[in-house]
Amino acid sequence: MNKFEAVILFSPDLSNPIINKEEDKFNKIVEALKGKIHEKENWGLKDLSYAINNYKKAFYKYYQIEILGSELKNIKKTLTQNEKILRHLFIKVNEHQELPTKMKNNEEK
């Protein structure tokens, strides 16, 4: 099993219940592929550096997951096909960082 940190950007048009439903879908996908979500953080609505699909803001969600690298392509394919998700990024790490993340700390200031 490999460790990954993931950031998923959701459309700013979505309400909290819809975002929660999309998060549940992501959780189920990871679990179905024998993976595990260790931690997650809500970074909230943030400005984008550049417009994505004519949006200048997005809801950021951060995850620490553990899954086989070979299964990651299935997750990426599913996320790419979801119109409610603007972007996603997975980074392989040796160890997960301690929470709260620096991004979360900046939000609280």
PLM feature segments, named:
Residues 2-109:
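Structured, basic alpha/beta domains of bacterial-type, RNA-associated proteins
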